[in-house]
A protein has these predicted regions:
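Short glycine-/polar-rich loops that comprise or flank the Walker A/P-loop
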Residues: 74-75, 98-101, 126, 154-157, ...
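Detector for small/aliphatic-rich hydrophobic stretches
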Residues: 1-79, 94-97, 200, 220
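Charged, alpha-helix-enriched surfaces in structured cytosolic catalytic cores
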Residues: 58-65, 108-115, 138-146, 153, ...
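Conserved RecA-like P-loop NTPase ATPase core
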Residues: 51, 102, 129, 151, ...
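Conserved inter-motif catalytic segment of the P-loop NTP-binding fold
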Residues: 74-142
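Hydrophobic/aromatic ligand-binding patch that stacks against planar heteroaromatic rings
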Residues: 69, 120, 150
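Phosphate-binding/switch region of NTP-binding enzymes
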Residues: 158-220
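A contiguous pocket-lining binding segment that forms or flanks enzyme active sites
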Residues: 125-166
Length: 220
């Protein structure tokens, strides 16, 4: 058992205050991968979600956390994109993501991305689908309705990543949860990403989430 020695000349009351201050400091320290209770895979299961950011790094960092959570729960994950460049694999691996278990589907355009997503949703084999759309947000409402319906029916989390300002409207009315991510602080390889929920059909808008991570400079 470890023992705590009282330094000469330090009263018991002073020691109690010192220990209390130390505990408070530890509570205030950022924890890598820290999450709020609402920001978890269960929040997005069965829903069409849009996660946007003016730069893709912040939203990528936050969705990596959901991918990792899904993999820890043995839920298969697929990443679908029509973009020429998407996430940097070493960044994902450093977050703990098993790249060998992550299915990546590349398509020609947004409609092909939506068709691939619908096909994978109908298979009922995936717990999380990420649609990396970039700046292309012209998804027709009937397509959104089909995707949202399949996500709900098969209890799959369907997350669309978009690159745009927070003031721009969501993909459409079928989006159940819309959130905007941004980097608020970075010191070396430790960064903070904040997400503001702009629309939530289940809980209502206005809640936020802060996540602390560690990664290559510029990831967030």
């Amino acid at each position: 058992m470890n023992t705590l020695a009282t330094p000469t000349g330090l009263s018991a009351a002073s020691l109690r205050h010192s220990v209390s201050d130390l505990k408070q400091d530890r509570r205030n320290e950022p924890h890598v991968g820290e999450k709020s209770a609402a920001w978890c895979l269960a929040t997005f299961t069965g829903r069409l979600t849009e996660l946007s950011g003016e730069l893709s790094g912040a939203s990528l960092s936050l969705v990596f956390g959901l991918v990792l959570e899904a993999q820890k729960q043995a839920e298969p994950v697929a990443w679908i994109t029509s973009r020429d460049s998407t996430f940097f694999p070493p960044d994902a691996a450093e977050r703990g993501i098993d790249l060998a278990a992550l299915a990546v589907v590349r398509t020609g355009d947004l409609l092909e991305t939506a068709k691939a997503a619908e096909h994978l949703l109908r298979s009922a084999a995936f717990g999380l689908l990420v649609l990396d759309l970039g700046t292309d947000t012209r998804m027709p409402l009937p397509v959104q309705a089909r995707l949202a319906g399949q996500a709900r029916h098969h209890e799959t989390a369907l997350v669309c990543l978009t690159v745009k300002p927070a003031k721009e409207p969501s993909l459409g009315s079928m989006v159940s949860l819309q959130a905007h991510a941004r980097k608020v602080q970075q010191q070396g390889r430790i960064f903070r990403c904040r997400i503001e929920v702009l629309k939530d059909k289940h809980r209502g808008p206005g809640w936020s989430h802060m996540e602390v991570g560690r990664g290559p400079d510029g990831l967030c």
